[in-house]
Amino acid sequence: DTVFLQYPADEYFLRDDYVIGMDAEKNHGLKSLARQLKDKGYKIGIITSASIDHATPGGFYASQPDRSMYYEIGVDAANSGFDFFGGAGLLEPRSKRNLSAPCLYDLFNQKGYTMFRGMDAYNRAAAKDKILLFPTDTVSKSLKYAMDRSAKDLSLPDLTKACLANFQETAKKGFFMMVEGGKMDWAAHAHDGGAVVKETIDFDQCIRLAYDFYKKHPNETLILVTADHETGGLGLGNSDMNLNIDLLQYQKCSQEALTAAMREMKSGKMIPSWKDMKAFLKKNLGFWEQIKITPREELELLVCYEESFLKKKSKDVVSLYAKDEPLAVAAIALLDKKASLGWTTKTHTGAPVPLYAIGKQAVLYSGRRDNTDMANVLRKLFLIK
């Protein structure tokens, strides 16, 4: 995964994508490009819509034999000295393997970090160095999906803008930022086409912020946009030559939010009738109103509703990052089908991913490149051996 973007192939041996920042035998830690730049005096920012100790952000600062060692990855984050961490907080602030180990929030504090919950708290403060910027919600494992959040919820563009503004003021030598639209991957694992689109648009806002900075500093800036892999095997076209992507505009919330709402209905004193459920699907997905639903399709939804709400026999549909209500999954799958989207897998694929570059020496990234070239070329640009 992302770790290949951080380490040369001769160090990492392209062997185990569950390892973060270690050699193939898991005996020695390796130094990522970001850590090498930190040693040279650059400011470093790590931004994600997942938690900051997840595999992708962790690949920029951690050295651990397994990506699921969230507490240990968090310790590496605190010890990294990186200047700005923004995301959904920490998955394991207290160690599950060593109960006497310190709380990570205390450790970050000891290392000189200031933590803020939400943009209001951050904007009111004067702190400029060693920032942690997390949501006000202390429970969630990720930022809210773009289509689910309110104006007060922390967003990936918020974090990008805050980090960029901070570094413009404080970075004397220069800076390196990594911004991950992690929820795109989560939505694709769950086959939620509407959420994928909205997360991509949200990520585009982050690119716009970086591009605006580039226009002011064209001779000092390099922007790279890529992915560590494709997820879900998303394809356009599933039955005929027509695409109906515009139907996704009627999806008002993510599959995750649909699941939460349906579970709340289930837990109430009165189980919603099929008529009530149809009204719910009409409001949130446009079914029977903007989107035509055939009698056969309605029957399939009805059977799913009865199994889940009346007979209570159905089990959650499990994907990598979610356990969703079967009716929510069936409804989103129907919408995706009508929008002409097709999926081939619930996991990652080997499909080539795009690489876009603009700015200083961007030509070095032209053509078809191996993923380890991402770090190798940057090392040459920064004169790192």
Q: What is each residue range found by the language model?
A:
Residues 1-68, 82, 357:
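Active-site nucleophile/metal-coordination loop of metallo-enzymes that catalyze phosphate/sulfate
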Residues 3-5, 15-20, 62-385:
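A post-motif C-terminal structural segment
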